[in-house]
């Protein structure tokens, strides 16, 4: 299972996915969640994933963990806490907001635990391969905070913490001292909101002199969504490893029966439109050349008035004109210096010696050029780049015939009004009972409307946004598992015993879906603080 990035939108939706899988029971006291052996997370999705890994290590009940984490997401004001901490920091250029966020996560969410707490209790966890994904800002490669279980030559099991990539890695002795909050902060460190988290400077290993002395490389880490916002690549790596080391060497099919992708990103985007003029028309018609002429004219006029006051012998007007003349002259000098520096900077770009032509451009034209370029760059980095990466990530599994009948995706937007389910219902590829009710559609529309932030605003809380997102993750997983079971009942190729186990859960899924149709939030716990 992979949890996508997307701030609190992803964290809450993915938590809903996790909680629903834990509600479907199998024989022997297990749940569907207990069948998840490989887990990856990116950015906001790392919040529920890392907390789940620690809960398993501590032997905590999953339902209790879900309720506590949902309360944390709904009620804790992390940004205010972080800003207060940042303002109290001693004034220095190394003050780091992401380091402070990591410390807050560790204190409020993880109880000041370390990776050693998860590693030493890995046998309690059904997940045998977990990766929290970040991006190495030294070489643009994925940086994996990866925990795996392996076998020793004598048959005993050993848990490994493999943190890094082909260029940078963190030694195993140091891995034990990395905290869950630090890994989570790196994974969710979005460029527009935070600076890179520097290793080892911003990590608690700096408190251990014996560890720091052996660290040779220094590098920055940021949001894993920059390289893989769906977290699919770590799952494929986990599958390769499991296939290599599985007991039955005669099997050649995939080692994983099913990949579940819990995803809050969207394939849709608004098309580009030029920005509208913000400058008043009177200002927009000006040019740098005309502004310079106005400055010179005003200086001449003030100088003439100064001479008139001098001839008339008026000390009052002489004083007033002296002050005005000084101000106008100073303004012209400052303007000339700034213009000279601006042109010098522009000449270093592709414009070169043609910089002088800018003097003839109207301010409205300059505004349009700057705003439209800024808008297109932001759109390219925050929309087009991520949409294309999403297509490539999904293509890695959906375009591979070996994954046929082994992929389920659950997305936050798919059950809104006007989505693909409507055309599927019309052409008969979606069972009538899976058409979402009006209540489910409206809840999905609300859930999908949230932006990518690491908090819920007061307005969003008043709207019930956290509850809508948790519910969307729950009924979305239910809906997609039912749709998947319908599909494999018609096409039984590339299936295993694990799929028959999933099909046996259909009565529970049907009962839950009927409840969701009537009340989409029937599974959402009440965590409202009085």
Regions inferred by a protein language model and the residue ranges of each:
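Catalytic domains of lipid- and phosphate-ester/thioester hydrolases
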Residues: 1-530
């Amino acid at each position: 299972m992979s949890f996508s990035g997307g701030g609190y939108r992803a964290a809450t939706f993915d938590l809903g996915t996790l909680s629903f899988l834990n509600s479907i029971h199998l024989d022997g006291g297990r749940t569907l969640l207990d069948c998840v052996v490989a887990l990856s997370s990116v950015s906001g999705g790392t919040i529920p994933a890392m907390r789940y890994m620690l809960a398993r290590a501590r032997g905590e009940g999953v339902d209790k963990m879900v309720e506590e984490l949902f309360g944390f997401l709904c009620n804790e004001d992390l940004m205010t806490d972080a800003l207060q901490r940042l303002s109290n920091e001693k004034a220095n250029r190394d003050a780091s907001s992401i380091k402070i966020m990591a410390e807050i996560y560790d204190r409020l969410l993880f109880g000041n635990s370390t990776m050693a707490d998860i590693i030493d209790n890995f046998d309690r966890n059904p997940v045998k391969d977990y990766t929290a994904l970040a991006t190495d800002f030294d070489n643009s490669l994925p940086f994996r905070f990866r925990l795996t279980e392996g076998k020793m030559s004598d048959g005993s099991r050993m848990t490994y913490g493999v943190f890094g990539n082909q260029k940078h890695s963190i030694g195993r002795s140091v891995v034990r001292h990395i905290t869950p909050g630090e890994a989570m902060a790196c994974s969710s460190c979005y460029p527009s909101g935070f600076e890179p988290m520097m290793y080892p400077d911003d990590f608690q290993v700096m408190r251990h002199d014996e560890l720091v002395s052996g660290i040779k490389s220094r590098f920055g880490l940021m949001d894993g969504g920059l390289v893989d916002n769906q977290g699919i690549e770590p799952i494929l790596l986990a599958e390769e490893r499991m296939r290599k080391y599985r007991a039955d060497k005669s099997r050649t099919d995939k080692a994983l029966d099913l990949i579940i992708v819990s995803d809050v990103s969207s394939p849709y985007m608004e098309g580009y439109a030029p920005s509208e003029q913000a400058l008043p028309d009177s200002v927009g018609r000006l040019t740098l050349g005309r502004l310079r002429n106005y400055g010179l004219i005003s200086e001449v006029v003030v100088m003439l008035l100064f001479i008139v006051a001098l001839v008339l012998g008026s000390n009052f007007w002489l004083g007033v004109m002296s002050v005005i003349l000084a101000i106008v002259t100073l303004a012209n000098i400052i303007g000339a210096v700034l213009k000279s520096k601006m042109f010098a900077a522009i000449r270093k770009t592709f414009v070169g010696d043609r910089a002088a032509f800018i003097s003839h451009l109207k301010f409205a034209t300059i505004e349009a050029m700057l705003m439209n370029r800024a808008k297109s760059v932001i759109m390219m980095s925050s929309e087009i780049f991520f949409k294309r990466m999403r297509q490539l990530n999904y293509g890695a599994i959906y375009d591979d015939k070996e994954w046929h009948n082994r992929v389920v995706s659950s997305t936050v937007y798919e059950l809104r009004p006007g989505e693909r389910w409507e055309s599927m219902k019309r052409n008969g590829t979606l069972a009538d009972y899976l058409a979402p009710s009006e209540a489910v559609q409206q809840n999905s529309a609300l859930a999908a409307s949230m932006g990518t932030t690491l908090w819920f605003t007061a307005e969003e809380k008043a709207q019930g946004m956290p509850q809508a997102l948790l519910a969307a993750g729950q009924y979305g997983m239910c809906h997609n598992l039912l749709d998947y079971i319908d599909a494999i009942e018609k096409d039984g190729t590339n299936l295993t015993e694990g799929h028959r186990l999933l099909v046996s859960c259909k009565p529970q899924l049907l009962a839950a879906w009927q409840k969701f149709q009537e009340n989409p939030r029937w599974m959402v716990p009440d965590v409202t603080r009085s």
